[in-house]
Amino acid sequence: MQCIFIILNYNDSQTTINLVDKLLHYSSVEKIIILDNKSPDNSFKVLKNYYNTMVKVVLLQSPKNGGYSYGNNIGINYVLNHNFNSECVVISNPDIFIAEQDLNGIIHVLDADKTIGVVAPMMKIAGADTFKISAWRHPCYLYDCFSSVPFFRRWADKFICYDKSLFIQPIMRVDVLPGSFLAIQKQVLQRGIKFDDRFFLFCEERIICEKIRNLEYKVVLSTLFSYDHYESISIKKSYSRATARQRLLNDSKKKYYKLYRSKNHIRNFLLFLLMDFNFFLMQLRGLFK
């Protein structure tokens, strides 16, 4: 049993190299596809020189930086247009590490149950034994409202977080998995499931997981296995200011509600107003730092 890795790089060649150099030694990895998202920092040249002679690595470059969904879709299209043996396709951030035994376990979960469309391991904070939120319920309107208000943000997590008692299950059926590591059945991708490249960054997980569930595949978290996540290194390198990341999040949420959710313009107006007010407060706080 093997898998194919798709790793999206943007202005972060060293983090990508750190991950790929480890994956090269895993017998369970058939091919590693690195998609450079038109990095302006010479990443593509660095990666090309570094992996030029390695047949296990395919290096692609997108014609533009279209964001997470756009870049990963190029990698998915490459997989579907080539005759690879693997039935498991892993969409991975470069700022993660997964041990080979954990990766093998995830591949086995998919291979053992073809009704599972996508699976992810538990997500740990790198260098610690602390787990991050590894899965959540599909965000509802109230969650998106309350999470837009700083005072209510932690309380709002109650709308989407699963009870800790559920995590004793080795295979836990969930709504949404984080986009930092998604192991997807190739047959799901062959049925036309891809990321919505109208979204530059954020909300991509809730959209693709919902698409997979709508095809009556299961979205599951495997609690027996884990991976380390280095606290969004890649995103923070590209968007160092919190206000820049918040602007992207707000833009994606607004687009999500316009395209996928309520057509109630009053509800949407109230949500968008909360998001814009929170963004204004963030900018105001930044002026006094």
Question: Predicted regions: what is each one?
Answer:
Residues K22, D36-K45, K64:
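A conserved acidic beta->alpha catalytic loop
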Residues F167-Q169, R173-S226:
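A short, conserved alpha-helix in the catalytic core of glycosyltransferases
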